[in-house]
């Protein structure tokens, strides 16, 4: 299923590319496919490789196919010139046991389609072996993508990173998921964002806006969140996600069930305007490539998802500089791989004609600099990378950055390319360019983008930008001040680290009308509550303190009772809202969707099945005086334990309940305060924060001190 404006054909089948877990397209059109016949849960050595496919005439049929290299669990690929960056595991044949996961670079100097020997490890141990050994490489570190700023961005799943090490000796540990970045030589590794669950890839637009589509099990089911990644942002998983949402950057949307996989920001001039300049997000569970229409909202965005292309269990997507879009279809290869399943599909606009993209390394200097003015994001990135090999052209590149007639995307590409070419020597010219409001945001970012190249960067330009009229500039300034390392700016950051709500007292919920003890598989509880003064009835199930695994609970025979003793079954009424952390909510149904039965095996057609944590809200019928039910676990629960709570409002279900906001509603008003607080933490500005307690800057100070 594709839009009528596109044409598609099968590029390769399982004979060449079974189990395609990832892919990338070189700017010049070569397609690299990561074949992982272990899938997410399989184990053992020798089941992975990277296949290189070449379609030199643009007819959609590869004339050449070679095994570029053999690696275990290939999960991310980037082609730059004659180098291929590969995210992969290591499973020695001698043990058959996963030993490590690395980011490596392979070279093919003669461009014959086969790597010249073993790859060089750039970052070792980018995912802890223990979890990968026990479960498989499913919540592990996955996709990689190159930004126009020259960093490689790594999508880290909720296995996290423990003891990763770069080529310069930098070590990094990050508990849980997030985005980590590193220079292409393996140096300067650092955390970009954290607090994510199971992301697979990142989409990066020409202005360094970054988007992910991950999933999480901490609310509303196993749901996916579409997130705008803002540098230094904390997105909540797992510690703040539910009960301290006022301290996180919220997602742009909670999109229900699914499994986010590959991601790409598409900006290619050969594509129809309708489908161009958009983030494309793969959803493996829904077999959909999805467009998210993003609209600026302060320093962030709002979004509207739109189905774009249906592809069977789509795992990844990429585009070359001629406009050929490729999608990797897992196509039912299962959780442990299947050599007879999987393929790669090609998409182009109707009427598209193949125009070969020249290798940037072969271009003359003038043509190469001009390529920064291309309307293709792929072409600009390729040009930028080749320009790094020609430092003598730095001034010509800066001329593009200065050119107000150039597109904004071209100017931004030139700013980041110039900084990479000239290093710290670029800072004086860039500081002068900060006076141009059209590019100020990216100038500020480039000045502090690399901590090793900040000589000559003064705090003044960043402090002044905290009060800029553009909220994106404000956020860039706060992030930059945190990286600059000068604690004397703490007072300026404290002034920015307020949401304007610090004076509002948090109102704690009142005690519930009923709260049971912990109920396990051997017990149940009789519930009889006076609801004569209730307007709404909140039926809450929380976990019993041991997590929510198999917490299949039920409100058995729930009824309202009036003063005359007449009973009204809840089954005959309509609830106002019902949300559960996992599974189904329904009468006569367990959370699993099976027939609801008591622990003794008795069918309960009037019972209301649910799962911890859940909240079900009913309007209280006129004349009702009591609510009665029996709370217990369903027969499908194994070792669950829960508590039942009845209240007239949402109670504090666990420690941390209070004045909090939703986890997936855009909140641009929090962004400057959030990154300013993170900057204070990075500057270790505890003394300034303590001094600010009790002043108008208490909110940010206390937030940072926590």
Predicted regions and their residues:
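Repeat-solenoid scaffold signature
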Residues: 181-222, 300-340, 460, 464-505, ...
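Structural detector for internal amphipathic alpha-helices that build alpha-solenoid repeat scaffolds
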Residues: 355-359, 377-391, 409-423, 428-432, ...
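Short, charged low-complexity linker/loop segments at the C-terminal edge of domains
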Residues: 235-236, 350-358, 563-570, 651-654, ...
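Hydrophobic, aliphatic-enriched repeat segments that assemble into extended interaction scaffolds
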Residues: 24, 32, 78, 83-87, ...
């Amino acid at each position: 299923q594709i839009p009528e404006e596109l044409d598609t054909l099968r590029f390769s089948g399982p004979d060449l590319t079974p189990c395609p877990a990832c892919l990338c397209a070189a700017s010049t059109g070569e397609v690299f496919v990561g074949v992982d016949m272990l899938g997410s849960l399989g184990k053992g050595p020798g089941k992975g490789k990277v296949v290189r496919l070449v379609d030199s005439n643009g007819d959609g049929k590869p004339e050449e196919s070679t095994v570029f290299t053999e690696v275990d669990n290939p999960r991310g690929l980037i082609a730059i010139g004659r180098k291929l960056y590969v995210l992969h595991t290591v499973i020695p044949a001698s043990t058959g046991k996963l030993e490590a996961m690395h980011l490596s670079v392979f070279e093919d100097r003669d461009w014959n389609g086969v790597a010249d020997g073993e790859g060089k490890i750039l970052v070792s141990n980018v995912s802890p072996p223990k979890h990968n050994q026990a479960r498989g490489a499913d919540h592990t570190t996955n996709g990689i993508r190159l930004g126009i700023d020259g960093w490689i961005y790594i999508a880290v799943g909720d296995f996290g990173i423990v003891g990763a090490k770069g080529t310069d000796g930098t070590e990094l540990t990050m508990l849980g998921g997030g985005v980590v970045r590193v220079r292409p030589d393996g140096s300067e590794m650092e955390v970009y964002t954290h607090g994510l669950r199971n992301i697979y890839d990142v989409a990066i637009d020409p202005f360094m806006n970054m988007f992910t589509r991950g999933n999480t099990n901490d609310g509303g089911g196993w749901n996916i969140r579409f997130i705008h990644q803002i540098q230094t942002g904390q997105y909540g998983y797992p510690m703040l996600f539910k009960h301290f949402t006022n301290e996180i950057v919220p997602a742009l949307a909670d999109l229900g069930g699914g499994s986010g996989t590959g991601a790409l920001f598409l900006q290619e001039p050969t594509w129809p305007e309708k489908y161009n300049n958009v983030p494309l997000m793969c959803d493996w569970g829904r077999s959909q490539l999805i467009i998210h229409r993003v609209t600026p909202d302060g320093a962030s965005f709002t979004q509207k998802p739109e189905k774009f292309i249906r592809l069977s269990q789509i795992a990844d997507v990429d585009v070359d500089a001629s406009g050929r879009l490729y999608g990797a279809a897992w196509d039912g290869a299962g959780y442990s791989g299947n050599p007879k399943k999987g393929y790669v599909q090609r998409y182009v606009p109707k009427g598209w004609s193949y125009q070969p993209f020249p290798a940037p390394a072969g271009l003359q200097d003038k043509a190469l600099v001009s390529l920064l003015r291309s309307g293709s994001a792929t072409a600009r990135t390729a040009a930028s990378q080749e320009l790094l090999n020609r430092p003598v052209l730095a001034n010509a590149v800066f001329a593009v950055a200065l050119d107000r007639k150039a597109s904004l995307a071209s100017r931004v590409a030139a700013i980041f390319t110039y900084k990479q070419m000239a290093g710290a020597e670029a800072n004086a010219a860039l500081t002068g360019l900060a006076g141009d409001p059209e590019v100020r945001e990216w100038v500020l970012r480039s000045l502090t983008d690399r901590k090793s190249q900040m000589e000559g960067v003064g705090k003044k330009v960043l402090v002044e930008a905290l009060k800029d009229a553009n909220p994106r500039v404000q956020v860039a300034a706060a992030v930059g001040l945190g990286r600059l390392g000068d604690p004397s700016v703490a007072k300026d950051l404290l002034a920015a680290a307020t949401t304007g709500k610090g004076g509002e007292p948090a109102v704690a919920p009142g005690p519930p009308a009923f709260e049971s003890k912990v109920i396990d598989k051997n017990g149940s509880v009789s519930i009889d509550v006076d609801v004569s003064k209730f307007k709404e009835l909140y039926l809450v199930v929380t976990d019993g303190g041991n997590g929510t695994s198999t917490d299949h609970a039920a409100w058995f025979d729930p009824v309202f009772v009036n003063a005359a003793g007449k009973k009204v079954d809840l089954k005959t009424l309509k609830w106002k809202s019902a949300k559960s952390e996992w599974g189904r909510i329904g009468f006569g149904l367990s959370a699993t969707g099976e027939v609801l039965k008591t622990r003794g095996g008795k069918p309960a057609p009037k019972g209301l099945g649910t799962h911890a944590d859940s909240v079900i809200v009913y309007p209280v019928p006129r004349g009702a005086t009591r609510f009665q039910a029996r709370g217990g676990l369903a027969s499908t629960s194994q070792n669950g334990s829960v508590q039942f709570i009845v209240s007239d409002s949402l109670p504090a279900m666990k420690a941390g309940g209070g004045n909090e906001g939703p986890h997936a509603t855009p909140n641009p008003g929090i962004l400057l305060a959030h990154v300013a607080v993170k900057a204070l933490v990075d500057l270790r500005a505890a003394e300034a924060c303590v001094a600010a307690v009790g002043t108008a800057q208490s909110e940010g100070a206390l937030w940072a001190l926590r």
